[in-house]
C-alpha cells in the first residue's frame, strides 16, 4: 500500500517546489492542486494524506473542503487562522498552524513602529517634505518606560523581549 500523497493547495513557484522536493527526497508523492483540472482536483482532495494550505477559503472552491474527510492532517502555512472558516472543514480533521513562525520579524516591525511614533517620525517627515525643519519639538525617550503587550503568543513574547532592551 502506498502512502497517501501530500497535497499543496495553494500556488507556489518553481523555486519553492524545488525546496519541497529536496526536503521530501521522494518520501512522499506531492500533488499541486493548482495544476489540476476539476475532476482531478476532487480525486486529489479525497485521497490526500496531508494538505498544506494557506487559506482554505481561497485555496479551495465551494464544497471542496468536505472532500478532506479522510485527510490525516491539514497544515496551514500561516501563523494564525482567525480568518479561516474552520466550520467548513470536516469534523475531526486535525488542523495545525504555523504559530510563531513570523514572531521575530513581526516583533521587529512592532518595535520599529513604536520608535517611529515616539520620535514623531511620520509627522516630522511630512513637515520636511514641505521644507519645514523642526528640531525643537521634544520627542519621547523610551528608556525606562513600560510597554504593555496585549497577547503573549509568539509575536507578543518576542515583542516583549525586544522592548526589554529599552529599559
Located regions from the model:
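Phosphate-coordination loops involved in phosphoryl transfer and adenosine-cofactor binding
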Residues: 3, 92, 143-147
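Loop/helix-junction capping segments adjacent to catalytic residues or to phosphate/diphosphate-binding pockets
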Residues: 14, 104, 157
Amino acid at each position: 500500500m502506498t502512502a497517501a500523497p501530500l497535497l499543496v493547495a495553494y500556488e507556489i513557484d518553481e523555486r519553492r517546489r524545488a525546496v519541497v522536493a529536496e526536503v521530501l527526497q521522494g518520501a512522499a508523492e506531492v500533488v499541486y492542486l493548482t495544476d489540476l483540472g476539476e475532476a482531478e482536483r476532487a480525486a486529489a482532495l479525497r485521497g490526500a494524506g496531508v494538505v498544506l494550505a494557506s487559506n482554505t477559503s481561497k485555496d479551495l472552491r465551494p464544497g471542496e473542503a468536505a472532500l478532506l474527510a479522510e485527510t490525516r492532517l491539514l497544515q496551514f502555512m500561516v501563523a494564525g487562522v482567525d480568518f479561516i472558516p474552520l466550520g467548513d472543514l470536516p469534523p475531526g480533521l486535525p488542523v495545525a498552524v504555523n504559530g510563531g513562525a513570523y514572531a521575530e520579524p513581526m516583533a521587529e516591525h512592532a518595535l520599529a513602529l513604536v520608535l517611529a511614533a515616539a520620535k514623531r517620525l511620520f509627522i516630522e517627515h511630512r513637515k520636511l517634505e514641505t521644507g519645514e525643519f523642526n528640531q525643537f519639538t521634544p520627542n519621547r525617550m523610551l528608556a525606562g518606560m513600560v510597554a504593555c503587550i496585549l497577547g503573549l503568543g509568539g509575536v507578543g513574547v518576542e515583542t516583549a523581549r525586544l522592548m526589554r532592551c529599552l529599559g
